[in-house]
């Protein structure tokens, strides 16, 4: 009797080991797919037209195409989910190395004013429009914040605050990416007739466009003077992601009517955002050489691109059509309003 029992125990152990090995392989496969997509997206983003879209946008689109054309193995989903959540947060922390708080301070209070005004205005207008078009609440918030602050990075940073699903996050990021690309092309065509100096045009681009890649591409016709100030204005908007994320979390929790008692640990504070600020402070103090900081930013974008790929791999095109059409229209109208406001503020604040 002892032999069969031992054989049964051995069989169970072997079966457990096989299952664990299969899970580890599936996890590694999921991570590998997102890494491959992120690398391909990086090189595609260096091509003449695709550089307008940027690595993050291309990664999420490739992910969606991959799912539609090839599919994602069931065991690999754990890896793609890990990339879209855990690696995302680590990437956002490292992205803080892109931000130099000293440069923002040198730009003066008017830059802070224009950033604060456009963010506040855009969140209210775009979210209001999504309600008019009967867009799902969480997707409406993500669309509003992505338009107002910093595109896909804002969408994925705000998503945990409103408990958004992966498909809502992916659709929100894709909408903002497409809108930003459209408006980048429009800005480039309109630059000669806007009547703005290179400096003023840079402020206008940085204050109103969605992604950093969009801002750099749109400001390029104005030369280095336009690009430099455009990036500073844009990064000022990025810096406001922290307070906006906290406020959105508090508002969403209250609007959902949660009456449970919460400790300070339960406050809707995206703790990884403080890592982002800490990295910004390190960069601002000049502790890390610029060359090293540049490499860290490249790694940050690679990690976030892997997260974008993971999101894309979790959403189908039919889901995008179902959830995204009305949100896209709301974002489009809101982006037009944002552009008009930005243009007016450039003149009103004397940035011409």
UniProtKB/Swiss-Prot annotation:
Top-level taxon in the UniProt lineage: Bacteria
Membrane-spanning segments: 25-47, 52-71, 111-130, 140-162, 169-191, 201-223, 230-252, 267-289, 291-313, 328-350
Keywords of the record: Cell membrane, Membrane, Transmembrane, Transmembrane helix
Keyword Hydrolase: no
Main location, first listed in the record: membrane
Pfam families: Cons_hypoth698
One GO location term (cellular component): plasma membrane
Keyword Cell membrane: yes
PANTHER family recorded: INNER MEMBRANE PROTEIN YEIH-RELATED (PTHR30106), UPF0324 INNER MEMBRANE PROTEIN YEIH (PTHR30106:SF2)
Protein's name in the database: UPF0324 membrane protein BCE_5279
